[in-house]
């Protein structure tokens, strides 16, 4: 571009003609505008010459109020006729590219900044994407002309504009400050080469993040797996073990590869985008996305592994849709083999799904092929998505992580760590989960059914209901190298070949799973359904006066804003009244009027369903609820008493609910909550003692309701402890204790009218027992029988009586005693027989 009015007129005319057809948008504009110093000159760096790219960039700059690339710019005495340059020269008509020196504009810019110490300039790398897709050998017509890793000629670009111009995206990146580079005093030539290198690396990483790495065709990838040393060795061993020829074993490995591998197809991604845009805005009230800018910043140059929580089958589609719409490559998604069914399986596979069997046991050849396929994706930098929980959570809680995929990922990284791996937690919060009604049976204790994509079709008749909004929060990324540095500082120096299974792999993988789960919970999206569920399920009759409900919700909002759970947690906008109206509009909150006003309540079916939404945020309410529990049996407590009992119970809550704070930070967080309680009148601080309100006061009622959020969890803990203490040392195995706890919980739920089937969830008791073992409170003898530390009795009689009412403790002890007697009678009967 020059100062020539004629050239500017021609460019303006071409831009207007281009936009008769082209539609463009800017990706992640805030990420670079926040770092942009508008008082300093701006230059735009384009990867290669393209008048169409320049026209699109100029248009987006005008829309955003940014300096335009086609206008002149001054740096000291240097006046450039245009504020852009091309890093590489233009290809010829056959697409061939000639390598030359540095761009003249960049040469003059480096010289100007070097010669004038008071001057600075900003270089903004900017890319235009005409469609997004990884490069493939065969695909849809549009894919032929989408942006790829091939050098683009003029004819190809013209066709790209015609076919893909209505889906054009512009990515501005964070500015590079020339003063910082020149300030390193490396001289003109070295600074110039360093700037070029920075820009080349940047463009390569950005292209990988947006359109995907340069990967081969599926057939080539699958066949390539068979030539990898670990798979070749597995083929030899399979032939020997099964007494078959190596050719047959190789064919078997090839069939496994074809069963596993995705068939990522851009046309299917675009088709899903259209369908899902309708779905999220027609069935749901849209998607609210938070903190995605962190992913956009970390994706370039990293192998990104997305680890969402798993609440619904539509989770599979949600992330791919969101990433595509925000200019990031949709991931390869790990899906259960049960979803590889006719039509549906093909669609999912072409949308990026790769399929895995539920168990790899007894099939080392399959294990080798699957592991090698995943390793191939990782080292090529292709984003991957898998669910650390394994299956969908039917209770709304974060399930205990399944470590299989994490272990494969760790082993792959130990094998080749050149491509840094980063885990990106992803919290998905539904105001109404699509399969909610199908979960009811399992919430009532029915046997879990085998997962099937057809579960979606079972709820088609319910689509007339209002489903509310979907919230998607991206959590704090976890860089695997940094995690390993903390767990195993010398992991890089260890000799790990040939299987890459160090002794510490299992324990480290377990801790990685816990870290991922904690980061997922940190990113929780609290919605109106969650808060209404917490409030109403804490009442004895599942009902509250309309005004009382408003006060409770206002209190919860105030507390959660005063003591944020984490920077990645989001809260609903508005006040208690707006939350009530929102949930009433979803037909989950019933209303009854009388002479004194309105009563809001839950019917039996909705009460069970609402436990799901309460459990979504139980980890957020656990600590304040525990603190409130202390003041149900004690009218006053010192800070030291509160901290002592909190420290005693917190490890069990943290382990079950994946609460974020380590024990070293607990005291500080407790102080923050106590200060918030005092601020809201829930406690008074008098002479170094915290005092509860009068039992007849409104504040005490609010404190009591808050304490009940975690009450059933504490009751389950006490049940297991009471059964152990009544049974005596070395009497019960872990499995027997687990069974007794389940039966006891079922009995108590009937006696006390608890309408929460998860109260007797066997897996929760199993995890509590394991936590006692991990903490050294329990031990197993050679026969597998449990013995306990004296501190177990102190926990029962010290901390438990502070948080559980006397009548509840008495009832639990009586049922525990009766259960032990029945167990002994059954054992004696078996002995006589």
Swiss-Prot record:
Keywords: Acyltransferase, Cell inner membrane, Cell membrane, Lipid biosynthesis, Lipid metabolism, Membrane, Phospholipid biosynthesis, Phospholipid metabolism, Transferase. It catalyses: sn-glycerol 3-phosphate + an acyl-CoA = a 1-acyl-sn-glycero-3-phosphate + CoA. InterPro entries: GPAT/DHAPAT (IPR022284), GPAT/DHAPAT_C (IPR045520), GPAT/DHAPAT_LPLAT (IPR041728), GPAT_PlsB (IPR028354), Plipid/glycerol_acylTrfase (IPR002123). It is an enzyme of class 2 (transferase). Coiled coil: none annotated. HAMAP family: Glyc3P_acyltrans (MF_00393). PANTHER family: DIHYDROXYACETONE PHOSPHATE ACYLTRANSFERASE (PTHR12563:SF17), GLYCEROL-3-PHOSPHATE ACYLTRANSFERASE (PTHR12563). This is Glycerol-3-phosphate acyltransferase. It comes from Pseudomonas savastanoi pv. phaseolicola (strain 1448A / Race 6) (Pseudomonas syringae pv. phaseolicola (strain 1448A / Race 6)).
């Amino acid at each position: 571009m020059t100062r020539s009015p004629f050239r500017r007129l021609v460019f303006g005319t071409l831009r207007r003609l281009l936009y008769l057809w082209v539609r463009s948008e800017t990706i992640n504009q805030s990420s670079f505008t926040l770092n942009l110093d508008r008082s300093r000159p701006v230059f735009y760096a384009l990867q290669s010459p393209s008048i169409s790219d320049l026209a699109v960039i100029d248009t987006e700059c005008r829309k955003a109020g940014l300096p335009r690339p086609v206008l002149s710019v001054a740096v000291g005495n240097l006046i450039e006729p245009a504020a852009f340059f091309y890093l590489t020269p233009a290809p010829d008509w056959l697409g061939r590219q000639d390598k030359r020196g540095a761009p003249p504009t960049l040469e003059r810019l480096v010289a100007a900044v070097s010669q004038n110490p008071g001057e600075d300039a900003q270089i903004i790398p900017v890319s235009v994407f005409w469609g997004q897709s990884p490069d493939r050998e065969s695909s849809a017509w549009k894919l032929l002309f989408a942006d790829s890793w091939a050098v683009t000629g003029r004819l190809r670009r013209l066709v790209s504009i015609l076919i893909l111009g209505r889906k054009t995206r512009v990515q501005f990146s964070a500015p590079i400050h020339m003063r910082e580079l020149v300030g390193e005093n490396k001289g003109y030539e070295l600074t110039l080469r360093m700037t070029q290198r920075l820009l080349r690396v940047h463009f390569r990483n950005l292209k990988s993040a947006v359109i995907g790495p340069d990967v081969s065709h599926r057939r080539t990838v699958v066949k390539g797996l068979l030539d990898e040393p670990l798979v070749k060795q597995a083929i030899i061993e399979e032939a020997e073990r099964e007494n078959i020829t190596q050719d047959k074993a190789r064919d078997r490995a090839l069939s496994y590869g074809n069963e596993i591998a995705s068939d990522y197809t851009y046309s299917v991604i675009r088709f899903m985008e259209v369908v899902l845009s309708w779905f999220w805005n027609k069935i749901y009230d849209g998607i609210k996305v938070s903190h995605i800018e962190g992913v956009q910043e970390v994706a370039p140059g990293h192998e990104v592994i997305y680890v969402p929580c798993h609440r619904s089958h539509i989770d599979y589609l949600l992330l791919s849709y969101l990433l595509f719409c925000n200019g990031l490559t949709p991931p390869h998604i790990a899906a259960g083999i049960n979803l590889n069914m006719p039509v549906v399986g093909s669609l999912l596979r072409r949308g990026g799904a790769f399929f895995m069997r539920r168990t790899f046991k007894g099939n080392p050849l399959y294990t080798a092929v699957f592991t090698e396929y995943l390793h191939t994706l990782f080292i090529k930098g292709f984003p991957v998505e898998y669910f650390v929980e394994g299956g969908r959570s039917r209770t709304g809680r974060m399930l205990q992580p399944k470590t299989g995929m994490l272990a494969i990922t760790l082993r792959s990284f130990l094998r080749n760590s050149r491509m840094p791996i980063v885990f990106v937690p992803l919290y998905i919060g539904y105001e109404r989960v699509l399969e909610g009604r199908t979960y009811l049976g399992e919430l009532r204790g029915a046997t879990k059914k085998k997962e099937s994509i057809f579960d979606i079709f079972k709820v088609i008749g319910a689509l007339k209901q209002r489903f509310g909004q979907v919230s998607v929060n991206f959590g704090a990324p976890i860089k695997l190298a940094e995690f390993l540095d903390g767990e195993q500082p010398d992991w890089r120096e260890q000799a790990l070949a040939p299987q890459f299974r160090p002794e510490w792999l299992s324990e480290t993988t377990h801790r990685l799973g816990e870290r991922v789960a904690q980061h997922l919970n940190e990113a929780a999206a609290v919605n109106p359904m969650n808060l209404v569920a917490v409030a109403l399920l804490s009442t004895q009759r599942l009902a509250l006066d309309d005004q009382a409900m408003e006060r409770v919700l206002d209190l919860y909002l105030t507390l959660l804003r005063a003591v944020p759970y984490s920077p990645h947690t989001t809260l609903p906008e508005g006040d208690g009244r707006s939350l009530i109206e929102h949930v009433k509009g979803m037909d989950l909150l019933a209303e009854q009027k009388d002479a004194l006003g309105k009563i809001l309540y839950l019917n039996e079916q909705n009460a069970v369903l609402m436990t799901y939404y309460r459990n979504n945020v139980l980890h957020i309410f656990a600590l304040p609820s525990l603190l409130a529990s202390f003041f149900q049996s004690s009218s006053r407590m010192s800070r030291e008493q509160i901290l002592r009992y909190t420290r005693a119970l917190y490890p069990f809550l943290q382990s079950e609910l994946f609460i974020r704070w380590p024990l070293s930070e607990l005291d500080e967080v407790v102080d923050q909550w106590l200060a918030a309680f005092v601020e809201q009148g829930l406690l008074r601080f008098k002479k170094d003692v915290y005092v509860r309100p009068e039992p007849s006061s409104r504040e005490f009622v609010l404190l009591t309701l808050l304490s009940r959020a975690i009450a059933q969890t504490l009751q389950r803990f006490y049940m297991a402890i009471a059964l152990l203490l009544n049974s005596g040392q070395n009497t019960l195995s872990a499995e027997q204790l687990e069974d007794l706890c389940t039966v006891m919980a079922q009995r108590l739920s009937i006696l006390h009218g608890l309408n929460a089937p998860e109260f007797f969830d066997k897996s929760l008791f199993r995890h509590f027992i394991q936590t006692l073992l991990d903490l050294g409170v329990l031990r197993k003898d050679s026969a597998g029988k449990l013995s306990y530390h004296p501190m177990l009795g102190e926990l029962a009689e010290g901390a438990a009586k502070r948080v559980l009412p006397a009548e509840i403790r008495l009832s639990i002890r009586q049922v525990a005693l009766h259960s032990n007697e029945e167990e002994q009678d059954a054992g004696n009967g078996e002995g006589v027989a």
